[in-house]
Curated annotation (Swiss-Prot):
Further remark: All late proteins expressed from the major late promoter are produced by alternative splicing and alternative polyadenylation of the same gene giving rise to non-overlapping ORFs. A leader sequence is present in the N-terminus of all these mRNAs and is recognized by the viral shutoff protein to provide expression although conventional translation via ribosome scanning from the cap has been shut off in the host cell.
Record family assignment: Belongs to the adenoviridae hexon protein family.
Keywords, ordered alphabetically: Capsid protein, Cytoplasmic inwards viral transport, Host nucleus, Host-virus interaction, Late protein, Microtubular inwards viral transport, T=25 icosahedral capsid protein, Virion, Virus entry into host cell
Lineage: superkingdom: Viruses
Protein's UniProt name: Hexon protein
Subunit structure: Homotrimer. Interacts with the capsid vertex protein; this interaction binds the peripentonal hexons to the neighboring penton base. Interacts with the hexon-linking protein; this interaction tethers the hexons surrounding the penton to those situated in the central plate of the facet. Interacts with the hexon-interlacing protein; this interaction lashes the hexons together. Interacts with host dyneins DYNC1LI1 and DYNC1I2; this interaction might be involved in intracellular microtubule-dependent transport of incoming viral capsid.
Amino acid sequence: FDIRGVLDRGSFKPYSGTAYNSLAPKGAPNTCQWKDSDSKMHTFGVAAMPGVTGKKIEADGLPIGIDSTSGTDTVIYADKTFQPEPQVGNDSWVDTNGAEEKYGGRALKDTTKMKPCYGSFAKPTNKEGGQANLKDSEPAATTPNYDIDLAFFDSKTIVANYDPDIVMYTENVDLQTPDTHIVYKPGTEDTSSESNLGQQAMPNRPNYIGFRDNFIGLMYYNSTGNMGVLAGQASQLNAVVDLQDRNTELSYQLLLDSLGDRTRYFSMWNQAVDSYDPDVRIIENHGVEDELPNYCFPLNGVGLTDTYQGVKVKTDAGSEKWDKDDTTVSNANEIHVGNPFAMEINIQANLWRNFLYANVGLYLPDKYKYTPANITLPTNTNTYEYMNGRVVAPSLVDAYINIGARWSLDPMDNVNPFNHHRNAGLPYRSMLLGNGRYVPFHIQVPQ
């Protein structure tokens, strides 16, 4: 039989970036722990999930509900195998009752080497989505023994009658970063430490693997009389035809070029014609609109608030004195003083800067790049791991805001300008090699 078709391998990633915590700041850590030089444990991060209002944290953990089905209220505590879930926090920014809430969260133990949150992935280990590793090499026949421990925290100002405000469910997970790599590493070791909280991640570069064109100078060929072959091979008269002069041959080539599709012709030779996105090879710039400031605000439009009670002037005294007004005014007034908390970001400048860095900076020659401190890269400079790990100083492209109407860096023209993720020739060559998402196949089995 003879089968020809195209296999769709499904998942394929011809872009930079990550699907794992893609909105996280690239220098933000996961909630995690580390030990200092005195072997004392430190915890840093977020406890996002509030417990039931009015219920305290107990040794069993964070109270997350009340079971009233039996007629008696029974506190429901978080199931440590997957609760509190790190993506669950307050339902709303509204918090005006003045009650003290207890909070819980998840943290990575110091034995899980810390990585930036951006790009972090840990496989689930149970059907609810919990990610903790098993303590035992073999799961127990009844209940798996997960590597999870509870850590309790109280306010630093409390000196007596301690009562935890926060419980962190600390765990070891199989932490991976399949789409990112470290580009800023303050610590000299990979182990969890205070300095490594400040690590920064960067997305991996798109990785197309395709061979180069061997006949890049060849336009078309002709196996019949125009090239002077024996007619027996060309099914014509058995006579040798003289070669045409150069002008005739060139005219014939140009005729074929205008009639046929060069890309289709090259594919017969397992080659690809390189294309180029015009915005990459030659950057067209007609100005960057950058007039208005762009602000971002907290969800509640205010920011952090303090709780205030109402007061009024005392009327039964000779001099003006103040008294609390708890008859008509609540004692839980959440008020922020000063202007609303806001931050400004220049969106246009960041989009332009990111475009230049991703499409120009990352494709500059290796001599313009450097290896980040404390990062070890392969000695073979031809490997993807080496090329992917090298970074460019952003200042190389930062300054090009007004660059004229048509502009390109010299290396974009004279140092392998086709080795770029926007070049359609690369994914096509990957496809021919069986490396891309779509893989043509042809299976022939003789009778």
